[in-house]
Each structure stands twice: as structure tokens, then as C-alpha cells.
Amino acid sequence: MMSPNGSLKFASQAVAKPYFVFALILFVGQILFGLIMGLQYVVGDFLFPAIPFNVARMVHTNLLIVWLLFGFMGAAYYLVPEESDCELYSPKLAWILFWVFAAAGVLTILGYLLVPYAGLARLTGNELWPTMGREFLEQPTISKAGIVIVALGFLFNVGMTVLRGRKTAISMVLMTGLIGLALLFLFSFYNPENLTRDKFYWWWVVHLWVEGVWELIMGAILAFVLVKITGVDREVIEKWLYVIIAMALISGIIGTGHHYFWIGVPGYWLWLGSVFSALEPLPFFAMVLFAFNTINRRRRRDYPNRAVALWAMGTTVMAFLGAGVWGFMHTLAPVNYYTHGTQLTAAHGHMAFYGAYAMIVMTIISYAMPRLRGIGEAMDNRSQVLEMWGFWLMTVAMVFITLFLSAAGVLQVWLQRMPADGAAMTFMATQDQLAIFYWLREGAGVVFLIGLVAYLLSFRRGKAAA
């Protein structure tokens, strides 16, 4: 059924709006805690003991994961009805799951901030099924169980929509990615006492999310947006999508081995990890060719929302640079021996997450939000200009954050890792030498926040395009 305002093809697509709005609120929180962390690198007692560095980092990374999950869920609720050519199976269930997930997320973050972590573990019964205390998987066991319940309800809702409607390559790839995301998260409940075994399966969640099934989600969202804004034949875009997804899975699954270099597994992982992870830039490069070829050479219509085309091209370029180029720079075992755990890792992580996943969520929000607000295909020119200012401020700021962290990482390797043990500078002494880069990174982070505010204001002030 067409929505009352005529901007949405199906009324149930409107349930995507709260997911997008809450995702952006959490995104702001993530950036604020990133700025707190960045300042704590150079002013060690900033906000101590109220917000220690380890707590700020935990909140920063957890907010990243949760806001992206909200973004993916909103994207699915928006595009699956349109791809399936039918209403969402249960908008009511989508609303219930939104409030459950939002409440669980807020309570978990408040728990990090207000209760000592050991106390939080006791309070939530972690001793009954110990899963806490691992990087990125710090959530209490009860929160992890809540995520599983929300994921099952979500998959049921979108899965039933797909089953009773039209089947397309885009919806099938998206569903494959979402199901894989949920299944791989189950390994967060496996916490063996053996540290090597723990790390081996820990990466099945962390790596196979961000360098595996999340790439399927990114590819499906990008393909959907390009179909809508270019008018290119769906068959052409679907062929590109199949090639990209095949390359992502072939390189990404065995490429997990580049995380196994130094955790105590057999030596053959040095070869497997190096060879296959060296192939991981290929799907991201293919996405660049895909987006630019589709938008610039096969255009059949002048889509009025210029900002969404900018986001669609930008996400592929930044993903290729961050996940592809910066990932390749330190993925080979002989190089990773020196760079592992340095600021080069942080440089890669920042640009890769922003380019591949933050930007693809902002792409679908840029496309969908005018319709969700009842405006139509695009907002007025002033709002689009403001949004594009937000794009450039955030993107250029992230490039400089990456460059400053890369410079810090190279110097860290030179001072701390390359010299023989007796001549190597200690960790803390090395950090003092990197302070200038941390200050520069903090400044770039402030610019990033300004860009994010501009992006948000573009929707608040937007009116229909003339």
C-alpha cells in the first residue's frame, strides 16, 4: 500500500526512520567519546576517574558497533519491502524490537559508565556463563542474549517479507549477510580458557563480520541505491554485485589468517593469511569501478539528490583506501611482525570502518530520509549543499586522522619495534614522542564532529526540492 504522503512506495517502510535517527544519535556519542579518548592520549588524567581511558574506549567501540547495526536494520526495513514489492511482514514487531534494542543498548552503555566493570560482571551474572572481558565483546552476557533475541525477531520479520514477495539478487545478498552476521555473533558466547583457542574463534566474530558478511550488506545497500538513482538495468548491477560478493568471501574467509600470525597457531597460517588477505583489496577496488561506472557512464536520469550520489561514490573510494590500501600496508606477515598493535592498526581501522560501513549507512540515510520525512526524492538545494559540506568535512577529516595516525605508527615502529631490545625505546617513552600526532589527530576529530553536525542539520532544515 502506498504511504499516505506518496513519498514511500510502501507505508511500512516508515519503520526505518526511528532506526536511522537513533543510529545517528549513537554516532554522535561515538564521536564524542572518540574525542575524549584522543585527549586522554595527551592529557592522561582528563576526566579521570569519572571516565577512565579503558571505559571511554569501550564505549567508543561499542557505540560504533551498535549504531552500525541500527543502520543496517533500518536499511533492511527500508529496502526489503521495495525489493520484495510488498509490505513489511510486521511493522509492529519492528517497532517492538527497536525499543528493546534501544533500551538494551542504552542500559549497557550506562552500565559501562556508572558501574565498575568487575561489578557489572557480578551484577549481570557473568559467572553463570562467562563471556565478558574481551575486546569489542565486552557486553554483559544478558546483553548478548538480548542481541540474539532482537536478531532472531529481525531476521524473521525481513525473512517472511522476502519469502512472500519478489526475490531479487539484492535482497538475497542482503539476507545472506544478515543471517551470517547473526550466526557468527554466536561465537561471542564461546569463551574457552585457552587463550589461543579464544583468540582463534574471537576473530570469527570480529574479522568475519567486518571483512566478511558486512561486505555483503554493504554491497547490497550500494546496489539498491545505484539501481534507484541511475536507472541502470538491474541485471547489470546484479552481475557486478555477484562478482564483488564472490571476491569478498573468497578473500575474506581465509584472509582471517592474517589475525593468526602471533597467537600460537601452526605456521602455515603465515602463508595463508598473507596470500589471501593480500587479495582482500580486490572486492573494494571492484566496488569503486562499479560505483563510478554506474553513476558516471551509464546514467539515464538526472537524479535530483546530488548528495546521495556523492555518498555512493565516496563510500567505495574510502573503503578501498581504508580497508584495501591501508589494510594491505601491514597485512603481510614479515611487515605485520613490526606493525602489529601500533598506531598503523588504528589508522587502518578508522578509515576502513568509516569508508566501508559508516558511509554506506549515511548513503542509504541520505537516499531514504527525504522520503521518510514526506519530502520526496530530494531536499532543497540549500539542504543538499549543507549535507555535501558535511560529507567533505567528515571525509577530509578522516583522511587526516588516518595520515596522522599512520605517521605516528611509522615513528612508533622506528623507535620501539625496529631496534634491538636493548636499544628500543620503551612504550611510554615512545608515546611521548608521538604527542604531536595525537594533538593533530584530535584537531581533525573536532573537524569531523563539525561535519557530522552539518550532516544532521541538513535533514532538520530540509524542504522539498523546487
From Swiss-Prot:
Regions crossing the membrane: 19-39, 61-81, 95-115, 142-162, 169-189, 205-225, 243-263, 270-290, 308-328, 349-369, 391-411, 434-454
The reactions it catalyses are:
nitrous oxide + 2 Fe(III)-[cytochrome c] + H2O = 2 nitric oxide + 2 Fe(II)-[cytochrome c] + 2 H(+)
Asked whether the keyword NADP is assigned, the reply is no
Instruction: Give the Enzyme Commission number.
Output: 1.7.2.5
Q: Which UniProt keywords apply?
A: Cell membrane, Electron transport, Heme, Iron, Membrane, Metal-binding, Oxidoreductase, Respiratory chain, Transmembrane, Transmembrane helix, Transport
Q: How does it sit in the membrane?
A: Multi-pass membrane protein
Q: Name one GO cellular component term.
A: plasma membrane
What does it do? Component of the anaerobic respiratory chain that transforms nitrate to dinitrogen (denitrification). NorB is the catalytic subunit of the enzyme complex. Shows proton pump activity across the membrane in denitrifying bacterial cells. The mononitrogen reduction is probably coupled to electron transport phosphorylation.
Task: Describe the family membership recorded for this protein in Swiss-Prot or TrEMBL.
Answer: Belongs to the heme-copper respiratory oxidase family.
Q: What is this protein called?
A: Nitric oxide reductase subunit B
**UniProt source species:** Pseudomonas aeruginosa (strain ATCC 15692 / DSM 22644 / CIP 104116 / JCM 14847 / LMG 12228 / 1C / PRS 101 / PAO1)
The lineage, from the top, is: Bacteria, Pseudomonadati, Pseudomonadota, Gammaproteobacteria, Pseudomonadales
